[in-house]
């Protein structure tokens, strides 16, 4: 039964990811000037696509950084469950109040980190930017647990390549993360080929320009994703089976993945492999 449920979850995540990429492409077309091109017609098409992921596992938001408010949201009511009535600010305060106690510093740490790291990125490198967050745990007001994975990307920028609009995609990966994992991590990739990185892991709180997984670990994980077994991986990379096992364990521990299947999925979602 557990295996069936896990497969269903992975299929749902893959479906959401595919729709996300379609939405991203459409969004770049819609938000291609100071104003929104054919706003009403295009937003209806965008909303139709977004409804493909409507449910309790994911939601998408197009955020306006000029007004500091969502331009469009789909799936957020199902995702967060029942919330008290109020304006956008009150709702955000309520949602942050749902953070599990181990993550109460997340809003402050992540904003401080992101602000500092963004200032370090040269103008010419501010392209193809993607921001991933993973591992933050919330408990809904009805008691249901949520573990967040989010992907954000700018879909319109100003002359200095500061964000005007971003597309933010949030999933509940509660079933992909180990129950005893009490950390979160963030990864920014950017550049023509996504070759530049900034990362942060709450376990050590180190600001880094290295990836969360090493080059060797990613080599191993790519082979795992291609269904190579431990012995085949060891032979392919001229290392021992024990070394393969150690790297696998270290990757699972670092990302908080529940198992190897979840590890591969998380790495693909962040484009580490």
Please provide the spans of the model-predicted regions:
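Sensory/regulatory domains in signal-transduction proteins
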Residues: 63-85, 90-179, 183
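Regulatory hinge/linker segments at domain boundaries
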Residues: 193-216
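Juxtadomain coupling helices with adjacent low-complexity linkers
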Residues: 23, 173-201
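Basic, Lys/Arg-enriched C-terminal extension of HTH/homeodomain DNA-binding domains
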Residues: 2, 252-273
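PAS-family sensory domain signal
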Residues: 38-94, 189-196, 200
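Short alpha-helical "packing" element that flanks the helix-turn-helix/winged-helix DNA-binding module
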Residues: 217-224
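Intrinsically disordered, low-complexity terminal regulatory regions
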Residues: 1-67
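Recognition helix of helix-turn-helix DNA-binding domains
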Residues: 227-262
């Amino acid at each position: 039964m557990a295996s069936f449920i896990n497969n269903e979850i992975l299929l749902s995540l893959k479906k959401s990811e595919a729709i996300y990429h379609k939405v991203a492409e459409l969004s770049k077309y819609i938000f291609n000037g100071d104003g929104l091109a054919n706003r009403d017609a295009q937003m209806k098409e965008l909303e139709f696509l977004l409804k493909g992921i409507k449910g309790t596992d994911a939601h998408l938001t197009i955020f306006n950084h000029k007004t500091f408010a969502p331009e469009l949201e789909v799936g957020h009511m199902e995702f967060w469950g029942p919330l008290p009535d109020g304006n956008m600010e009150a709702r955000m305060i309520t949602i942050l109040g749902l953070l599990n106690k181990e993550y109460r510093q997340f809003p402050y740490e992540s904003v401080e980190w992101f602000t500092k790291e963004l200032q370090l990125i040269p103008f010419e490198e501010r392209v193809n930017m993607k921001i991933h967050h993973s591992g933050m745990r919330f408990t809904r007001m009805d008691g249901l647990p949520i573990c967040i994975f989010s992907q954000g990307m700018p879909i319109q920028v100003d002359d200095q390549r500061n964000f005007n609009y971003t597309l933010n995609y949030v999933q509940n990966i509660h079933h992909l993360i180990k129950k005893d994992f009490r950390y979160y991590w963030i990864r920014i990739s950017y550049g023509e080929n996504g070759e530049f990185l900034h990362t942060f892991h709450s376990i050590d709180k180190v600001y880094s320009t290295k990836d969360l997984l090493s080059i060797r670990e990613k080599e191993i994980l790519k082979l795992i994703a291609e269904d190579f077994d431990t012995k085949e991986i060891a032979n392919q990379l001229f290392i021992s089976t024990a070394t393969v096992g150690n790297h696998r364990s270290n990757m699972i521990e670092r990302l908080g993945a529940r198992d190897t299947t979840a590890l591969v999925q998380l790495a693909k979602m962040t484009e580490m492999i």
